[in-house]
Structures are given as C-alpha cells and as structure tokens.
Amino acid sequence: MQVTICEESVCMRICVIGLGEVGLATAKYIVDKKLDLWGYDISSAAVERARKVGILKVTQNWDDVPLSDVYLICVYTGLKDEVPDLSAVFDTCEKIKVKTRQSTKPLVSVESTIVPGLCKRVFREIFDGRVHLVHVPHRYWAEEPVDHGVKQSRVIGGVDSESLQAGLKFYRDVLGVPLYVASSIEVAEMCKIAENAYRYVQIAFAEELRMVCEECGLNFDDARKACNTKWNIEILEARDGISGHCLPKDIRYVTSLTTFNILMKGALTVDEQYREWLKNRK
C-alpha cells in the first residue's frame, strides 16, 4: 500500500496541523502551488490569520477535516521543567490516527522540533505501522522567507524505505524542496536540535569574548574583525543575549539527552552571565 500522491494536484489532499509561524508559511506555500489544502489549529487567532492570507479551508474543529493523503505536523514543541515537552506531537498523532484507513497509507511528516527516537515510537505505539512516516525538520526563518523559507535545502529521514520514498515524492517532486537524505530518521531528528545548539554555542563564545576584551580594555568589535581575517575563523557579533524561542529551547533538547553536555551547559551559563553583565553596564 502506498500513499496517494498523483501527478495531478487534484488527486492529493494535504492537511497542515499547527498554523503558527512555520505551519502558516507552509500552508501558504502549498496553497500558492494550487494544491488542495486544509489547515487546522486549536487557536481561533491562528485560524483567522490563515484566512487573512488566503487559506480558506481552515478550521478549529478536527472533525471538519476530511481524510487526507498527507498530514504535515507543525505544532509547537517546548520545554516543561527544562525537559522536552513533546505532548503536542503525540496528541496530533492520535488525531491523525482517527483519520487513517486500512486501505491506504497516508504520508505523515513531522516538521516540529523533536528528539531522536520519537518518530519510531509514534509509528509503533500510535500508528501501528499504518502510515508512511517521515521527519523533515523545518529551517524556516521569518526574517528571510524567500531565501530561508519553506523551499530551501532540508533534511529528510523515514521510519522505513517506503516512508522515505513517499516523503521524497511529496517534498521533492510535488513541493520542489531540495532534500538531503539522512542515513536514518534518528539522524534527521538530531539534525535540527544540533544545528541550533551549535549556533547557540557560537554566539555564547562571542559573548564571552566580548566580556574578556572589555575586561582587558580592548574593543571587542575590533578584535573580532581582526580575527575574522583568517580564512577559517568567523566570530559572530555579541548583541543583547540569545533571544527567541528556538535556540534556547533546542540546546536544552540536546543537553537533556545525555550527560556529555559540559560545553553546551557552559554556553547556557555564559549567556546568563552575559545578560547580567550587560545589565550592570547600564
């Protein structure tokens, strides 16, 4: 049994679940390609925003969503007591399970940020293998939606070879998204949180170096620019602390996996120290 993804767009129905920053951009991208899309979110404000950008088939009522060929999970995942809170993904998979039929296998793609092992767990425990399941972590950046929007180089992993092929057919062939195929779905799951943890550490280094430079009576920007003349060095700017929700959250996803986290936990401490340092300078 294979997912129904036809050459003609009218053959395929897609459902985007979670219409926040990433889900809304994804849904708009799909609608602009004239594909049959349904959007779902528990928030009335999110539903209203979707309507304002031209997504007309959108609802807060899961029962209104028809059976679909593709389900894209774009729900927010956060932290609870400093550990990953993935309950929204589990709840969404339970909703999708109700929509699955024995005769066909829909494609389910988890775009939300998760930890290694989650996809195979929901594949076994919730779907009982009755779907094609892939993980395609988003790299969406709202400040540059053209270059870093839905259609940019992304990573894909599947729970099995059939799932991977279904995912490739949809993302690469239908949506036109360039893909790097990970060696396993666990590698794809690790990819997003590792990328953001790496970025966090880079910024924390710049923050610490700025404090060191000023302690020594040096101008940090002058030192940074001098260092960056070397071909393999690119020290980032140190601004107002590491903000947003993705980087601070995702580095904690990584540190929650293991005790081998001294560098990353140190980066978290540096950012706290840097914020306090900035406050005391005013």
What are these regions (language model features)?
Residues V3-R13, K34, E214-K282:
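NAD(P)-dependent Rossmann-like dehydrogenase/reductase catalytic/cofactor-binding core
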Residues C6, K99, R121-V136, Y140-W141, ...:
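Internal alpha-helical scaffold of NAD(P)-dependent oxidoreductase catalytic cores
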Residues V70, L79-A142:
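Rossmann-like NAD(P)(H) cofactor-binding subdomain of soluble oxidoreductases
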Residues V75-Y76:
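Conserved NAD(P)H cofactor-binding loop of Rossmann-fold oxidoreductase domains
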